[in-house]
């Protein structure tokens, strides 16, 4: 390592952001770039561990100590080579990943972890700015064809790996643009879509073909694709949202998070979305049910739309400020965090469960009846019991359901192919990422269930190796996951 005492000399710096009063008036990226000298010092805090546990936290197996040291030594072009060796899309993970690698950082045992995520993002941004990112087309073609169904991070990772291996790859996306949740689920202020588009341009130059408006299993029979292509990779994600079937669910003003986020993202893309198709929070009291990342995306969006007030509800208790005794390193630290959206305002309410939606005489939601709850163990299972005499009412005109996703959509594609599902309703696969149907593979949330973007990319890369092996009898493609 270039600076073995860096972790002693320099403390962890915080991610810089645009001022709240400025950023909530537009939809541009909220994060600011780090000064180069600051990044070099942050990279120097990587402490030359005998066993770098950051690898344990990263599903991709990123060579984190290598590129931290290269940044410290101002060798940025070498750094992007090390970074791309394990990660197709560091601009996505460097922006959107919660950084489980930092949760496993050895320095985090008794100090603040290394700013791995910030250094990663700086490397890839510098590489694009310098023109170091160029298409990497294959030396020759194999004559084999692969259809990737779904264009989220898992599908894109699989497609790029397979195209570079010489296969002719076509990505099918049911929406009108490529990107999946990266396109229409992630708000513009969190990741500007130009970041996605520049990577897609590289993939097209490498030979990947994109087909949009193609809902395989609905307007394109799955069997037709099986006849046309030598292999299929199912990367359709876990798109079925978790509902809240309580009294009043049918009221106007109660929406799934994705039904709220998608039209606004379309407007940010420049689409003409009619006012009646846009779910707007302007001038309304808003309640977001769900305390995860999707809830935070909704929170930042309602701020920019001009909500009157916002409450975000979470059924779990408020996390502690530091690790609990039963949450030791190198586990992911379950601690209280403040995202950029939370820093912009709104009230977070913990240990509550919604009892019913209350409507007015016109059939519109006007309030929520909510109860305090406490977690208890029953037969080894965590359940939430209502605290007696704890109910209260939250007035609102808009409710957003952001409680996650329960799995892939079964009608259409999965039913037509006849793939086997797990007990949790996800697509089942073998050790080579193939389903029970020969030549049909799967990766990402469709087989794992809802998860992190870093897992999706890792699974896409791993499935690509399985496909390559199936088509060619062997494969030299790397696979970070078994």
Model features per residue range: what roles?
Residues 78, 140-141, 145-149, 197-246, ...:
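Feature captures the FAD/FMN-dependent oxidoreductase FAD-binding
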Residues 123-140, 198-218, 241-305, 421-436:
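Glycine-rich dinucleotide-binding loop and its adjacent helix/turn
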């Amino acid at each position: 390592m270039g600076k073995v005492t860096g972790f002693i000399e320099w403390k962890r710096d915080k991610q810089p952001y645009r001022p709240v009063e400025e950023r909530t008036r537009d939809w541009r990226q909220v994060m600011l770039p780090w000064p180069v000298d600051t990044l070099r010092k942050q990279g120097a805090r990587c402490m030359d561990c005998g066993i770098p546990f950051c690898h344990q936290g990263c599903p991709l197996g990123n060579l984190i100590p290598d590129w931290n040291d290269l940044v410290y030594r101002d060798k940025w072009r070498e750094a992007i080579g090390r970074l791309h060796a394990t990660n197709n899309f560091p601009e996505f993970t460097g922006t959107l990943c919660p950084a489980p690698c930092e949760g496993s950082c050895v320095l985090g045992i008794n100090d603040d972890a290394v700013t791995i995520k910030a250094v990663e993002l700086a490397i890839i941004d510098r590489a694009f700015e310098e023109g170091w990112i160029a298409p990497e087309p294959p030396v020759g073609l194999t004559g084999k064809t692969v259809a990737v169904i779904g264009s989220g991070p898992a599908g894109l990772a699989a497609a790029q790996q397979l195209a570079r291996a010489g296969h002719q790859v076509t990505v099918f996306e049911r929406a009108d643009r490529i990107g999946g949740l990266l396109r229409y689920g992630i708000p513009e202020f969190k990741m500007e879509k130009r970041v996605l588009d520049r990577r897609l341009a590289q993939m097209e130059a490498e030979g990947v073909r994109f087909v949009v408006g193609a809902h395989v299993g609905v307007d394109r029979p799955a069997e037709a694709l099986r006849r046309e292509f030598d292999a299929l990779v199912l990367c359709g994600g876990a798109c079925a949202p978790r509902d809240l079937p309580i009294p009043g669910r049918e009221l106007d003003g109660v929406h799934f998070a994705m039904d709220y986020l998608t039209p606004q993202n379309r407007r940010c893309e420049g689409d003409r979305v009619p006012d009646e198709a846009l779910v707007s929070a302007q001038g309304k009291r808003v309640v977001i049910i769900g305390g995860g990342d999707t809830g935070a995306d909704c929170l930042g969006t309602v701020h920019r739309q001009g909500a009157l007030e916002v409450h975000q509800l979470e059924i779990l208790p408020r996390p502690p400020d530091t690790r609990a005794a039963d949450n030791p390193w190198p586990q992911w630290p379950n601690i209280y965090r403040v995202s950029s959206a939370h820093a912009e305002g709104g009230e977070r309410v913990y240990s509550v469960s919604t009892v019913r939606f209350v409507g007015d005489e016109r059939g519109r939601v006007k309030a929520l009846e909510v109860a305090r709850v406490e977690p208890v163990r029953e037969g080894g299972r965590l359940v939430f019991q209502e605290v007696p005499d704890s109910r209260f009412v939250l007035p609102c005109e808009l409710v957003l359901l952001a409680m996650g996703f329960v799995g892939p959509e079964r009608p259409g594609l999965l039913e037509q192919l006849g793939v086997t599902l797990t007990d949790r309703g996800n697509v089942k696969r073998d050790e080579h990422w193939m389903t029970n149907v020969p030549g049909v593979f799967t990766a990402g949330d469709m087989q794992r269930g809802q998860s992190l973007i870093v897992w999706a990319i890792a699974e896409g890369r791993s499935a690509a190796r399985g496909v390559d092996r199936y088509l060619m009898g062997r494969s030299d493609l790397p696979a970070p996951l078994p």
